[in-house]
A protein has these predicted regions:
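Short beta-strand-to-loop acidic/aromatic patch adjacent to the donor-nucleotide binding site
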Residues: 21-34
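Catalytic core and acceptor-binding pocket of nucleotide-sugar-dependent glycosyltransferases
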Residues: 77-182
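A short acidic, often aromatic-flanked loop/helix-cap motif at beta-alpha or helix-coil junctions
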Residues: 1-5, 56-57, 150-154
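Conserved donor-nucleotide/metal-binding helix-loop-beta segment in metal-dependent transferases, i.e.
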Residues: 31-75
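Active-site-proximal specificity loops/subdomain of glycosyltransferases
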Residues: 1-22
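Alpha-helical elements of Rossmann-like donor-binding domains used by nucleotide-donor carbohydrate transfer enzymes
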Residues: 13, 40, 48, 102, ...
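Short acidic (Asp/Glu) patches
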Residues: 7-12, 70-81
Length: 182
């Protein structure tokens, strides 16, 4: 299940299996590739590339912004991850490109934090949130460039933000909330 998958994707031993490769492409069964651009994405040299998580306009409303700020102050500690933390980040893991040496180094450096993720449940502790939020030294593509790699959450908004251009691929295309778009 999801716990086993998260455990594997946060395991140094998993990435060591690919030590003779520069990158690995994670392409889950609910991902789709539209164009042959993998080599181009590898050439950019990023540590991690995944679909960006867009911040919808509703979160810019003053009352909502105030609520999110208060939520951070009341419930967020230094290591506490809240759902709002992923807004504007690059990181969905279902279709993602990962630099093997960087993943191995992060699994070593953040081993304690990875174990915390493995022990906790909930979407904010899925492995892709770890990769998007924990390794601060990782080189990620800017949000706008990541739109050219993949869409996952809110594909209609991503398509608009990408000025009507489809990405290299997508993830989660058959989810109920996404299927009408795809």
């Amino acid at each position: 299940g999801i716990a086993g998958y998260n455990d594997m994707m946060l395991s140094k031993s998993f990435y060591h299996l690919f030590a003779d490769c520069n990158y690995i492409l994670i392409c889950q069964t609910d991902a789709w590739i539209f164009r042959d651009e993998l080599e181009q994405w590898c050439d950019y040299g990023y540590d991690y590339v995944g679909a960006p998580w867009p911040k919808r306009k509703v979160y810019e409303l003053p009352l909502i912004k105030q609520y999110l700020w208060l939520r951070r102050k009341l419930f967020g500690g230094e290591d506490r991850i809240l759902r709002q933390d992923y807004f504007g980040k690059v990181g969905n893991g279902g279709l993602s490109l990962r630099k093997v040496t960087s993943a191995i180094a992060a699994c070593e450096k953040y081993a304690r934090r990875a174990e915390e993720f493995k022990l906790k449940q909930g979407i904010v502790y899925n492995e892709d949130w770890f990769w998007a939020l924990v390794p601060k030294e990782f080189k990620y593509p800017p949000f706008d460039q990541a739109l050219g790699f993949s869409f996952d959450s809110h594909p209609e908004l991503c398509f608009k933000l990408a000025k009507g251009k489809l990405p290299f691929g997508c993830h989660g295309w058959y989810k109920r909330r996404n299927i009408a778009f795809w």
